[in-house]
Amino acid sequence: MDEIPLLEVRNLNKIYDNGYHADKDISFSLPAGKLVGLIGPNGCGKTTMMRCINRMHEPTSGDILIDGVSVMSQTPAQIARLVSNVPAEMTASFGLTVFETVMLGRYPYLQNMWWETDEDETMVVDTLKKFGVYHLQDRALNMLSSGEKQRVMIAKAYVQNPRLMLVDEPTSHLDMKYKLDVMEYLRAMLKQNMTVLVAEHDISLMARYCDLCIIMKKGELVAIGNPKEVITEDLIRDVYEVEATVGLDRDGEIYVLPKHYAPKNDVFQNP
């Protein structure tokens, strides 16, 4: 008997009221315990698809299943227990502290919205420590650096205990150290047997950390598979309409560079 995918998207279409067809008949499935990169140019439908998966946007047609159950029949509270979200744009914090912000991730489980249990508080404290922001728990979220805010928002999504985490452009505006830190934290999620779907523009970063990559162009799914197999110079040319060199570094990790930046020594080799 075939294993049920953690996430299955069936013939997803999203057409906005102005007639714009953002996602076009998209179908794919993802197993549990995978870090999955979602890449493609601006406007290719990545964010729209993720918003349809968590029902922030209603699909025009198609179905989305988590562990074999359609989210189309789920209430918002039920979906919040299955899917957590780390948005690209930081929403207003309304003066909340780091602790209060992360506690919001527990609200789908509370019997009374404002009555957190000792168990909830312990879970939040443990999560703050896990993500290295425990010392910031009493600080206002809007007083943190971009990297610290990103860790807090990932911690909030983690404490929600979802099956699927959707992360939209988590490394934007971060330096390389924070980018690598964020990706390490996302990989750590996989120990909970959840799947993490990350929309990102840094192709090399996705190729280095992700188990699978989904590539989109103009609302359509172009390819899905192992990064070392699907990320090629031909694909970059077709999807991004630029010339790039795709190769392997001395550690066997993929790099993607514009042609004029490509290294010219034997440390690198084309796959």
Language-model features, listed with the residues they occupy:
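Conserved ABC transporter NBD signature motif
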Residues: 62-70
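ABC ATPase nucleotide-binding domains
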Residues: 239-271
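Conserved structural motif at the start of ABC-family nucleotide-binding domains
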Residues: 7, 22-23
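Helix-to-loop junction immediately C-terminal to a conserved catalytic motif
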Residues: 54
